[in-house]
A protein has these predicted regions:
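Short, small-residue-biased leader/transition segments that mark boundaries at the very start
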Residues: 1-8
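Long hydrophobic alpha-helical segments that form multi-pass transmembrane helix bundles
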Residues: 10-21
Length: 156
């Protein structure tokens, strides 16, 4: 699988207890830099604190699309099958999780077990702990306000 399209230049880092710090961390030159396509697993075992704290990818990136769901916020491509998935969203972030907690105990279709890192998830979202982080987009919903969010996963 390759690439994350317009994933932005920064992500929301964790401290050593897996809590979001409230900062934005530039990704340039780190294993979290997907601005240029490369395989997801290529850098996943790098000696980098943000990967070590969650044993792989389980991070939120700030999206460059800023609420514009008319262009892809991210994409992933499997060169073996030729499948491509594009993600369009109005959300400000995307969480990418690489199955770091899978241990081969959960089974799926035909009773096949899901081993460590045998999946990847793309979850559009606001940033974790945003009510307590003044730098993050607000998630406060006041009486009378309506929340709208739109996400499309398009397969080719």
């Amino acid at each position: 699988s390759r690439g994350l399209g317009d994933v932005y230049k920064r992500q929301t880092p964790y401290d050593d207890k897996k809590c979001v710090t409230g900062e934005y961390l530039p990704v340039a030159g780190t294993p979290l830099d997907f601005r240029m396509p490369h395989t997801i697993g290529e850098r996943i075992d790098a000696d980098y604190p943000q990967l070590k704290v969650v044993n792989g990818y389980d991070h939120t990136w700030e999206l460059n699309t800023k609420g514009d769901d008319t262009r892809p916020a991210a994409w992933v491509y499997d060169p073996t099958s030729g499948r491509k998935m594009e993600i369009f969203t109005t959300e400000p972030g995307i969480q990418i999780y690489t199955g770091n907690g899978l241990k081969g105990k959960m089974t799926g279709k035909r009773g096949i077990a899901y081993p460590f890192r045998s999946a990847v998830c793309f979850e559009t979202m606001h940033f974790q702990d945003s009510p307590n982080q003044p730098e993050f987009p607000s998630t406060v919903l006041r009486p009378g306000e309506v929340f709208h969010s739109h996400t499309v996963y398009k397969f080719e």
